[in-house]
Amino acid sequence: QPNPNEFFGLM
């Protein structure tokens, strides 16, 4: 599962 940091990194 993708890490929260990865998700926010896209933003």
Curated annotation (Swiss-Prot):
Similarity section: Belongs to the tachykinin family.
- Which residues, renumbered to this chain, carry the PTM Methionine amide? M11
Location within or outside the cell: Secreted
Organism the protein comes from: Pseudophryne guentheri (Guenther's toadlet)
This chain belongs to the protein called: Substance P-like peptide 2
Q: How would you summarize where this protein is expressed among tissues?
A: Expressed by the skin glands.
Pyrrolidone carboxylic acid modification sites?
A: Q1
The UniProt keywords, alphabetically, are: Amidation, Amphibian defense peptide, Neuropeptide, Pyrrolidone carboxylic acid, Secreted
User: Does the record bear Calcium in its keywords?
Assistant: no
Q: InterPro entries, from UniProt?
A: Tachy_Neuro_lke_CS, Tachykinin_dom
GO biological-process terms attached to the record: defense response; neuropeptide signaling pathway; tachykinin receptor signaling pathway
- UniProt keyword annotation of Secreted present: yes
Q: In terms of one coarse class, where is the protein primarily found?
A: secreted
